[in-house]
Design a protein with these regions (language model features):
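Helix-rich terminal scaffold detector
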Residues: 1-4, 10-17, 185-315, 319-325, ...
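Flexible glycine/proline-rich
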Residues: 34-39, 48, 94, 158, ...
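Solvent-exposed alpha-helices and their adjacent loops that cap or buttress functional pockets
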Residues: 60-62, 77-80, 98-102, 115-117, ...
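Short, low-complexity N-terminal leaders and the immediately following helix N-cap/first helix
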Residues: 1-79, 108, 153, 340-367, ...
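Short, conserved secondary-structure segments in the cores of folded domains
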Residues: 46, 58-59, 87, 97, ...
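Short, glycine/charged-enriched hinge/interface segments at domain edges or termini
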Residues: 2-17, 67-237, 385-386, 421, ...
């Protein structure tokens, strides 16, 4: 039996992760559709059913380089009984046949070229006398074939008039290929949400600037922007704002055309009040405590920028807290705006390599590295040594969150833990595919 100690207390004044998420998602809806180039549509959601105007293939065509023949002509053909046929034409890919095939005849044909009338099979070059042939007007067939062998039938892929992509489908590389195959260069999708990113703090300097005493590089803007890209949004970056009302309001005003603003820092109870004052002045912003670690402090509400009402999500300034808060709340908001089904990350069971200690009664998202032991074939979770919310390397090294519930003090080494996977390799994919 797992050696877990139940808590005797609970943070009743806090919102659960699920409660906070529900409150946030209630303020979002699916965005409007937009016609975009198919090469820009990867990962987007199709806004309406797509019906093909053509057949794919548009005609019976050859699946091989070879000779179009009539099956009955070669019923007795083999290596010792070569059947010779008269070659009446050559049909390159991109050309239409000009002649009808009769018994005793063949057409030399390339892959993708239309099958001539009268033919019902194709014999590949390697099963003919192609290589040793000196008479281009004749070809020897060395095998018998089945009806329609090596022929791709008209409309076997896509049939004219059929719905080939349903509304709500997520566009993949294969989808883009299908769209191209029916001649479409553009597609109607739910547009990608534009996410404004704004970090705050006098202590920040930008990457590329000279390091200064008392300053730190602004990593949150770049981490959050990368997550927006990863989740299928479009980041709009503002240079970090100083702890001055005028500067913060100026930077926020430049984000008036976004679908969501994400700020980092300034949302904890002990933080400098400039951020809270500006948010309170310009909107209806709630400061929450969420029953999770990292990322307990969270701000969310609607801010008014020049008459436009824009949702604002304020995440903590510590880099790991910012990432986890955006994963737990921002990703879901982006999915809802994109019209995607809002889904949790996959969870697997893994055996702990060392203890996970939960010392303050919040749901703990411990950064862990999951792998499959080559000898035992067991799934192992190794907690990253330094679990501080300021240690960004813990997110770099991890591929999942080991979840310790709020009412548990410790999950011990050797016990099983639920791991929420946020990235994985082929090895972990196999576990996900085979899990109960």
């Amino acid at each position: 039996m797992n050696n877990k100690i139940r808590k005797s207390h609970y943070h009743a004044d806090m919102l659960s992760v699920e409660e906070a998420r529900d409150k946030i998602l209630s303020k979002f809806s699916t965005l409007e559709p937009k016609n975009i180039d198919i090469l820009e549509s990867l990962g987007c959601v199709v806004s309406k059913d797509i019906i093909s105007d053509i057949n794919v293939p548009p005609w019976d065509n050859s699946a091989m380089d070879g000779y179009a023949i009539i099956k009955s002509d070669v019923e007795k053909a083999n290596e010792k009984n070569i059947v010779y046929l008269k070659v009446i034409e050559e049909i390159p890919a991109g050309s239409m046949p000009e002649l009808t095939l009769s018994s005793g005849q063949a057409s030399r044909i390339m892959t993708g070229a239309p099958i001539p009338t009268g033919s019902n099979a194709v014999v590949p070059f390697e099963d003919t006398t192609e290589l040793e042939n000196t008479d281009k007007n004749s070809i020897g067939i060395k095998i018998k074939v089945e009806n329609y062998e090596n022929i791709r039938k008209k409309s076997e892929d896509i049939k004219e008039g059929n719905v080939i992509i349903n509304k709500g489908s997520i566009i993949t590389s294969a989808t883009i290929g299908m769209l191209a195959s029916i001649g479409l260069s553009k597609v109607s999708v739910i547009r990608k949400p534009i996410i404004g990113i704004l970090s705050t703090g006098d202590e920040l300097i930008e990457p590329g600037e000279k390091n200064q005493l008392g300053k730190i590089y602004n990593s949150n803007t770049y981490t959050l922007s990368s997550l927006v890209n990863e989740y299928g949004g479009i980041p709009l970056i503002q240079k970090h704002a100083k702890d001055q009302v005028e500067d913060l309001e100026k930077k926020l005003s430049k984000l008036k055309n976004v679908d969501l603003i994400v700020t980092s820092a300034g949302v904890s109870k002990g933080d400098y009040d400039i951020v809270k004052d500006v948010l309170d002045k310009n909107g209806d912003i709630n400061l929450w405590s969420v029953n999770m670690r990292p990322a307990k402090p969270l701000a969310f509400g609607i801010i008014d920028i020049e008459g436009k009402k824009i949702p604002l999500l304020g995440v903590p300034g510590n880099p790991v807290s910012a990432m986890i808060a955006f994963e737990k709340f921002g990703r879901y908001a982006i999915d809802k705006m994109k019209g995607k089904e809002v889904r949790n990350r996959p969870i697997i069971k893994a055996i702990l390599d060392s203890d996970i200690i939960n010392h303050d009664g919040r749901r703990l998202y411990a950064r862990v590295k999951v792998f499959v032991d080559k000898n035992s074939k067991k799934t192992i979770a190794v907690p990253i040594t330094n679990q501080s919310s300021g240690v960004l390397t813990s997110m770099h090294e991890a591929n999942g969150f080991g979840i310790c519930p709020s009412d548990i003090d410790i999950i011990k080494r050797g016990e099983k833990v639920d791991v929420e996977m946020f990235t994985w390799n082929d090895e972990i994919s196999e576990i996900l595919n085979n899990k109960d």
